[in-house]
Amino acid sequence: VELSYLKPSEQKEFLEAIAGLQAIESGSITLLDDNGKGTELAGMDSISINKAGISLAFVPEDRIGMGLVGDMDMTDNMMLRSYRNGKSPFLDRKGPKALALKIKEQPEVMTPSISAPVRQMSGGNVQKVLVGREIAQNPKVLLVAFPTRGVDVNTSHVIYRLLNEQKKKGVAVVCVIEDLDVVLELCDRIAVFCGGKISGIEDGRTATKEEIGLLMTKHEKGGTLA
C-alpha cells in the first residue's frame, strides 16, 4: 500500500503512529491476522507491540538517528533490534554479527568491514543496512518511509526488488514513495490523502496518474485504509 500526497510531517506521523511511536488523537489502527481476527494497535507503544508478539518492522525516513546509530558498526546496529529478545543478562553478539555478515553479502553493502561505523558509508549503503535489518525480522507488516530518497539508481532498484520480494511473501508493505511512476508499478493499492483525510483508495494495477491527481485535490470521498 502506498500513501500519496501527505505533507512531510503527516507522512512521518502516520507511519510512526502505526509503529507505536506516535500517539493518535482519534480513530483506530487495527491489524488483521490470517484468520481475520483484529488486534487494536492504537494506544500501544513500540515496546508493547513487540511484547504482544506483533511482527512489525519500520524503515524510517531518518536513517542515521532514528533508524541506525552512525557511530556504531553494523553488528551493534543489528543488536539494536535483537537485544530485547535475549534470555541471558549478557549481550550475544554472535547472532547480530552473523546477520551483519549476511547483509553485507546480500544486498551487497559496500564497506571495508562490518566493524566500520555506518556513518562512513554512502547513503545508499546505509539504507541497505537498515532495510536488510528490518526485513531480517520476518515481519508481517513492513513500514517504509521514502526508501530511495537520496540514493543512486542502482541502489534504488535493489531496494525496490527487496520490497517486491517481501510483498510476494505475503508481507503487508506500507510505504511512502515520491515517484508516482514507481508507485503505479510497485504498489497493489494506493491510498491518497488530502487535507489530512483519505480521499480515495485505488487499485495500483489499474489506477492512472490522472485519477490519482484528481484525488489529491479533494477529500469528500473518504475511506478506510484496510
What are these regions (language model features)?
Residues V1-A226:
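Glycine-rich phosphate-binding loops of nucleotide-dependent enzymes
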